[in-house]
Regions:
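Nucleotide-activated donor-dependent transferases that construct or modify glycoconjugates
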Residues: 16-39
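Phosphate-binding site of ATP-dependent enzymes
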Residues: 188, 194-352, 362-380
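A positional/structural detector of protein chain ends, strongest at the extreme C-terminus
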Residues: 479-483
Length: 483
């Protein structure tokens, strides 16, 4: 149990004179039980009260604030929300992606996102901003981070049919690959790809190219494909697979498919987030993924997700979980390398100036160093020398698993066992600390910018615009006269 705070299943009173006011933003889906599968019978996300209480524990004021879609059209709904939200210094948006398009006036999601972007432009902190969710959560983020510690250099993005056909035929002629669609969150449209000898019904051990670009695959070359949502296996020619990716299973020449998802991964083009990302298949993926759970710039937990039954997918219920502190030796080096990457992470994603998400995850896959003498398939590489590469970022309303267990039914936060409650509150309390830290830094940065501008023009500067000091810029430097 927490040594500092007693359990609270309801929102705590905010401290008097708190330096910052925050709100946890929620939305009730019209007609859905509890207002959505992420909520309890009180209509709140089960993690919303602990997140708000985490802010309160850290010294901030925090309320629960709901977006109401029943006021009128999208503009009217957003205007009413703006009136309520404008009083806060920061918003923690806990609305699942897509919920604002369920039973709402047309254009609600776009109008809400525009309001969040306007707040950000004015200096209000939003976790997570629409831009962060779109660009950090997109699969082509893996291309942008390819030169960081957490990236894989031979990572490519395809936005057109021509890019896909040319690129994949080149990469898969050299080594096994993983193709990842941009849409979906449970492994659908993520394909592991191996060359297969159809005549002998065996895996091809020696690929045609000895280096990338030496040779390319032909349309009739044969592939073994595994989809990560359920580990099912299919065999297709390169041409059939490419047609499925572009036109779906009914595309002319696509062959017969078992996948329950429709392909068409490039549909709508780049503007509609249609894309495929092509990465090297790391053979140690069967050891599972390592999820690094982050609050702002701090790791709260490392979670090893091991596939069950000899599978390769650690998605959802297909895996068993082992939890590690960030200081545990097994993943300490991984966490430290992530910390080293953080200052470069958002700039590499063209997100410089945006705040880090308040709650986000990185899913890592283990690999042997490229210089490992025994090659990528060897399993004798020790923990200290094992490298890790990011397979996915998630920053879109990340759930807190030990609270999620009571979502969607008749149970409430009070039904979460004490051990799970206090474990989960370690994360929500850290989120509160990080939220206040980021607000303090944002305030300091604004003050420094104002001072720099004042120095540049020789203005009077002081708290809240009070003329306490006159800064004069001369050839010999700056002089200050105190009022």
């Amino acid at each position: 149990m927490s040594k500092r705070y007693q359990r609270s299943n309801t929102l705590l009173p905010s401290p008097v004179g708190a330096p910052f006011r925050l709100a946890v933003v929620q939305f009730t889906v019209p007609g859905a039980k509890n207002g959505g599968s992420d909520k309890g019978p009180d209509g709140n996300r089960v993690d919303s009260i602990p997140i708000a209480n985490g802010v309160i524990h850290a010294g901030g004021a925090c309320d629960l604030l709901k977006f109401d879609s029943g006021i009128g059209d999208a503009d009217a709904c957003v205007a009413a929300f703006d009136t309520a939200a404008n009083q806060y210094d920061a918003l923690i948006v806990r609305i699942n992606p897509g919920q604002l398009s369920q039973g709402t006036p047309q254009g609600t999601q776009a109008a809400f996102d525009a309001l969040m972007n306007m707040y950000i432009a004015r200096g209000k902190l939003i976790w997570s901003s629409p831009k962060i969710q779109t660009q950090m959560g997109a699969k082509d983020a893996l291309v942008h981070i390819s030169k960081l510690n957490c990236g894989l250099e031979d990572t490519y993005a395809y936005y057109t049919e021509e890019e896909l056909f040319v690129g994949f035929k080149k990469t898969c002629a050299f080594q096994p690959r993983v193709l990842k669609q941009n849409r979906g969150s449970a492994g659908e449209g993520i394909w592991l790809c191996w060359l297969w000898d159809k005549n002998s019904n065996t895996k091809v051990e020696r690929y045609p190219a000895t280096y990338l670009g030496e040779k390319v695959l032909k349309d009739n070359d044969y592939l073994k494909l595994m989809e990560m949502n359920d580990n099912h296996v299919e065999f297709h020619t390169v041409k059939e697979f490419m047609i499925f990716c572009v036109d779906g299973p009914t595309g002319q020449g696509a062959g017969s498919w078992k996948s329950t998802f429709p392909g068409e991964y490039l549909k709508g083009g780049k503007a509609a987030h249609g894309q495929l990302v092509d990465q090297r298949l790391l053979p140690r993926i069967d050891e599972g993924e390592v999820r690094i759970l982050m609050a702002g710039d701090t790791c709260q937990m490392a979670i090893h997700k091991k596939p069950l039954g000899g599978g390769l997918s650690a998605v959802g219920g297909n895996s068993e979980y082992t939890y590690y502190r960030p200081t545990d030796a097994k993943y300490f080096g991984l966490v430290q390398k992530l910390y080293a990457d953080i200052p470069k992470l958002l700039p590499s994603l063209e997100l410089e100036g945006e705040p880090l998400p308040l709650l986000w995850t990185c899913d890592y896959i283990p690999k042997n160093p490229d210089t490992w003498p025994k090659g990528p398939y060897d399993r004798s590489c020790p923990d200290a020398e094992t490298e890790y590469t990011v397979g996915e970022f998630n920053c879109s309303c990340v759930g807190i698993s030990k609270f999620q267990a009571v979502c969607g039914g008749e149970k409430t936060l009070a039904d979460v066992p004490d051990a799970d409650y206090f474990d989960a509150c370690e994360l929500t309390d850290l989120m509160g600390i990080k939220a206040i830290e980021m607000l303090v830094k944002a305030k300091e940065d604004r003050a420094a910018k104002m001072l720099a501008e004042a120095v540049g023009c020789g203005c009077w500067v002081g708290p809240r615009g009070n003329p306490l000091m006159k800064v004069e810029v001369t050839e010999n430097g700056c002089t200050c006269a105190v009022q």
